[in-house]
Amino acid sequence: MSPLGRFSAVAQSRRQLNNVLRRFASNEAPSSVVVPGVRPIERIRNIGISAHIDSGKTTVTERILYYAGRIDSMHEVRGKDDVGATMDFMDLERQRGITIQSAATYVDWHGTNINIIDTPGHVDFTVEVERALRVLDGAVLVLCGVGGVQSQTFTVNRQLARYNVPFICFVNKMDRNGATPLKALDGLRNKLNHNAALIHLPIGKDSNFNGIVDLVEGHALYYEGEGGLIVRKDEIPKDLRVEAEDRRQELIEHIANVDETLGEMFLNDQTPNVQQIHEAIRRTVVKRAFVPVLSGSALKNKGVQTMINSVVKYLPDPSEVVNRATVKTETTGDEKGIILSPKRNNDKPFVGLAFKLEAGKYGQLTYFRVYQGQLSKGDTVYASRDGRKVRVQRLVRMHAADMEEITTAYAGDICATFGLDCHSGETFSTDQNLAPHCESMHIPEPVISMAIKPVNRKDADNFIKALTRFTKEDPTFRREYNQEAKETIVSGMGELHLEIYAQRMKSEYNCPVELGKPTVAYRECLGSPYKFHFRHKKQTGGQGQFGEIEGVIDPLPSDRNTVVEFSDETFGNNIPKNLFPALKKGLDAIVAEGPLIKSRIAGIHVRIQDGSTHAVDSTEIAMINTMQNMMRESFEKANWLLLEPIMKVEATVPTEFQGNVVTSLTQRNALITTTDSTEGYATVICEAPLSDMFGYTSELRSLTEGKGEFSMEYSRYAPTTLEAQDRVQAEWRQLHGIADPNEKGKKKKK
């Protein structure tokens, strides 16, 4: 054998040995080989790894891949080997050391197929978390052992609740100074209102952290050998036995409060065995009544295998989650809800949701979650939105940037296909007549805008191609062309969001661009109800136009002030029902520009209560014009206000700088809500208008000698102060060369 051949053989033997070690990492027998895609439903898990930025979730995912034998070596997010973490495969992700887009992979863990989506932690990329959680059955919430529950944790928690996703909590970075699972536990209970309890106790503090106490099984676990591959069981250390017993009792009490079986045993003074506790944890986790809290350090290779075991033990398989769709009845055309079958066969037609689009080497890559039936290569599927017919030419499973060809995907699987021209959130089926609609994901509204243009005019074609692709892939990245200023405007979730796309245009399309000064995405809303009675009548020699509407425009409450609502509250047939779509169409068109600074109108409810029509002249265009002219009249007569995005800001700084930082935030009109101090660092949480937070990164660095950092996420829209509204309007008029109407009035009086 040649030297190269001997080297390859040795390398292969070493990989095989490592795989065997990984299989025995949790003292379980290796699974038998099963063909992927036909595994029983109870041996499938679809999970996401979610967290606040810099909590270590990508490192956690990297360890999962390694221990499951998916990769042969581990790399760090900010590694010195210039390789980077497997799931951060974009060049920009590796350069910046952050996750920008969600990435999918799958592993085999002792006979269970785990589909994993690693999601970004930065708030600017929150839509990636939204579309991941929409199609997942469970999640691992990663918390930092030092930081505990942080600002983005609140957002992730709301997203988990929105899609009813059960989760377990992994407290990471237990090797860091000041790390403790108790801070995370307190945050879960008192900040996020979860029924949570520890199932692990750390052994050793800070840099001496070297294992965990498994409170359910009643023993200690140590992670030894190269990469922590060997998991050694031992007795619980003497100095932890009393605390372990107390925490175990606390665990049982928290489960007994929400589980009938364990509750009865607790009331009857019966002690549950290990298996009964495991089963009770699973029952309560699946119904989102309990959150088990685990501990470990992904970077130091401790606790991850035990966490993967908990994913299999406690998180639901696809058959334990009820997934619904709406279809139209054949007789009346009314919508009705149906429950999708999780059976992994073709008894029922395929139903799948396209939840993510991505431009790949071979064209558009469309990620699917299969909810019912099976999808095979060569199948014809129909889009429920418009009935268009598409043939599935290639079917793959993703592992970060790599893919594996498959022939069939079954209910519960996550797969991808090429050449499917569609939009994110569309539902497809093999039954042309079924036309099911799965509930789509929540898409937050952009809060910041910038002008953008290519540096070189010759790059105009690539500039348009890049914008077209990125706006199709990311529904929170939007563009429009300002005819007045003759410039393209892009909008997104934050400065970083837009900067990343600008850099991608340069790296992926060889089109360097210039970004303008950031501007706030204001909204315009009514300050008080406005009653209207408007008649539209137009006679031009031919067919005339007529429409009359009466009703009220109400401002919506603060929790709904980003939408526009329309309702028919008429009695009788003064306005025929078939004309209301035209009124709605007119409303949808005119709310694009409000009366103050031509920002989008939001937070209003237009209620039509009465009116009249003409048998001939009340055409669709007549009713559209009736609505639009009524709104224009309201622009003159009603009390309109500006709404601005309010951001939740979390600043972490050395305690000696806390006073200066609080002062600086207050000067930016921030309302301080919480301050906390731990191990020499202070955390300041506040709410501040987005318009007042531009440039704060530089100021914070200056105030804290470069040691402070802050994160910011959208909280809500709220009315500006009258002074701020006057200032914004004056700046807008100056920018567009429009005279102040109040000044004209003053001159006339003189």
Swiss-Prot record:
Where is it located?
A: Mitochondrion
GO cellular component terms given for this protein: mitochondrion
Which InterPro entries does the record associate with it? EFG_II, EFG_III, EFG_III/V, EFG_IV, EFG_V, EFG_V-like, EFTu-like_2, G_TR_CS
A biological process (GO) of this protein is: mitochondrial translational elongation
Q: Where does GTP bind?
A: 51-58, 118-122, 172-175
**In its keyword annotation, does this UniProt entry include Nucleotide-binding?**
yes
Tell me its EC number(s), please. Answer: 3.6.5.-
Pathway it acts in?
Answer: Protein biosynthesis; polypeptide chain elongation
Transit peptide range per the UniProt entry: 1-24
Keyword Ion transport listed: no
Family as reported in the entry's similarity comment: Belongs to the TRAFAC class translation factor GTPase superfamily. Classic translation factor GTPase family. EF-G/EF-2 subfamily.
Per its database record, what is this protein's job?
A: Mitochondrial GTPase that catalyzes the GTP-dependent ribosomal translocation step during translation elongation. During this step, the ribosome changes from the pre-translocational (PRE) to the post-translocational (POST) state as the newly formed A-site-bound peptidyl-tRNA and P-site-bound deacylated tRNA move to the P and E sites, respectively. Catalyzes the coordinated movement of the two tRNA molecules, the mRNA and conformational changes in the ribosome.
This protein's name: Elongation factor G, mitochondrial
Q: What is the lineage of its organism?
A: Eukaryota, Metazoa, Ecdysozoa, Nematoda, Chromadorea
